[in-house]
Amino acid sequence: MEELFYVSRAMRYAHIDIARGIAIILVVLGHCCQSTDIALNRVILSFHMPLFFFLSGVFAKSETVKTIMGGVFLKAKKLLIPQVTLSVTIIILKGSIWLSEGKNLSDFDFFACFGFWFLPVLFLCSICYMTVFAIIDLHKAQFKVVTMIIAMSLSVILILNHVDSEIIPVDWLIKSTVAVPFYFGGSFFKERVLKVSNEQRIYDNMLLILLLPIIVIVSQINSPVLMYKNEYGMIPLFFITSVLGIVLVVELSKRLVNMPVLIEFGKLSIAVYVWNFLIVGFSVRVLNRIMLMLGLDNEAILTAATFSISMIILYLLSKWTYNKLPYLYGLK
């Protein structure tokens, strides 16, 4: 996930790693939920993808007309190689199951295994940012405002018209149009996000505490935000939960000074993302069978058990591959 995953190894911001850790854990938890309609998942879905794009935008790289191709190559390496790792792994596993069932390999849908949308959309957002920055000086406030107005307008138009496509690259373009305002927002508010003050005023903390119940209430009023389906519910409610969720996680991360677990997951977030689809899917199937054998039928227990086991496996697998096989994530 671009700079969301790849902050300079020589200079890291602990609270950004914490924010990334919170974000990726929410992704895993959301995938462990048995339905998009349950209250917990509606809350997670209401802001977690905008949060990813915003955090990535914080470390967006500006390029000139002369250096933009080098910037595109670097982003392709850091974002599309993990995408290939994920897709090839899915092809191998699903293809093996397909053949074991006696089916013809020629009928296997290889292209569907490349349909995971987040990393390609983030790649498109980064290209858009580099292109705009090479043409316009986004350091100037007036250009920031105009750029954000245009980006927001395009995003709203697409959502209002329910634009969708079954063609994968076109679908990525549609999603990137909705994601761009959050990505640019991360860049525009970079100084505010990276600044950590030792003075925490009481009323700031009180306002922060109020954000969570507001997000919970609004997310239950709105329909589930399903970005993978290009479904966002009511536009004002989508943007309210997105912005409040971003503020909540960013500001909360500044107050969680010593959280090594979150920092570790933040550093490993690209690896956790790549493997979470497989691990969560495997865990839920195994645990579901065990619960049926025991005569248990409780979604909350299944979700909690799936999440706990998946997090342990994901940490071990992500840690090992990140250190031993960094090329899987475009690191070398």
Residue ranges and their predicted role:
Residues M1-K332:
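Alpha-helical transmembrane segments and their immediate juxtamembrane cytosolic regions
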